[in-house]
Amino acid sequence: MADDLDILRNDTLAALAGAQDRAQWDAIRVGTLGKSGALTGLLKQLGRLEPQERKERGQALNRLRDELTAAIEARGRDIEEEALQARLRSERVDVTMPAPAVVTGTIHPISRTIEEMTAIFGAMGFSVAEGPDIESQWHNFSALNTPEHHPARTEHDTFYLPPKNEDGEPRVLRTQTSGVQIRTMLGSKPPIRIIAPGRTYRADHDATHSPMFHQCEGLVVDRNITLGHLKGCLIEFLRVYFDKPNLPVRFRASYFPFTEPSMEVDIGWSKATGEIGGGSDWLEVLGSGMIHPRVLANCGLDPAEWQGFAFGMGIERLAMLKNGIPDLRSFYESDLRWLRHYGFSAFLPATLTEGV
């Protein structure tokens, strides 16, 4: 009976030697060691033999099973290694070939302008404050000394939202980020030095206006703050932002409900060429003023002890002036060609201003 074991051994080893892939190898393994395999069938026949013969036959079958199991496992490892080497040869990469071009995104001009403004004011000691886009009328208007009859409160200029808040007031999409200034003065003790960039909303839409746009407002509250501090801060910002150390800057008397005195700020430019800092024309870029005493009082600050100044500017407007962008609506059209042209590399710093 040993002859049949030798035949099974030789046939199995020969089949393993000829196996070329995992499927052939697995068929041999199942056909030999599986539940219906040849060796398993011989083991099942042991019960029919006499005790002494069963003992000898069983020992021989166990030795054969161990031998074939080891041979099958070894051949399986060899087949896997051969398949790996074949795949590596077929997938060989020539590292001397040029890498495929990678299309990278760009930083949106609005995001980059906010980064630049944050860096410049950060070097002056300002921090960034944020607030909700949906405001109460008190934070958006009343606390800022804006009277009930002011045209900014009408639905022609402001988006009102239902339902009313817990005080019965209709909520609004903020028309300015000044509400952040109010929240900061209510929640923080002076001295305060913040800027508040963010989205604002007004019912207007044309080449130079959008129903949603971005503003950056600034606030300084401290003792003995004067108009000279305001002028020095804004002149420094504008000259660094436009990279014009001698940029002409002019302050004109104006009116805002929340500042007194109030001033519009103009920069020198050429109307004919659009050059910033050139020519004899003036271009308005932002509004500013000393914080109105009523605004300070509304926030629990004594106007006799604390003074301050505030300013606000349109982020899109500054981005358009600096980068030669002609139409405000282009900022929101998601045109990849426009973004590639006016966008900024993510690997370049926003500004070289010290303190970033």
From Swiss-Prot:
Species of origin reads Gluconobacter oxydans (strain 621H) (Gluconobacter suboxydans)
Q: Which InterPro entries match?
A: aa-tRNA-synth_II, aa-tRNA-synth_II/BPL/LPL, Phe-tRNA-synth_IIc_asu, Phe-tRNA_ligase_II_N, Phe_tRNA_ligase_alpha1_bac, Phenylalanyl-tRNA_Synthase, tRNA-bd_arm
Q: Under what name is this protein listed?
A: Phenylalanine--tRNA ligase alpha subunit
State a single Gene Ontology molecular function. Answer: tRNA binding
Q: Which Pfam families match?
A: Phe_tRNA-synt_N, tRNA-synt_2d
Tell me, how does this one assemble? Tetramer of two alpha and two beta subunits.
Q: Which family does it belong to?
A: Belongs to the class-II aminoacyl-tRNA synthetase family. Phe-tRNA synthetase alpha subunit type 1 subfamily.
**Example GO BP:** phenylalanyl-tRNA aminoacylation
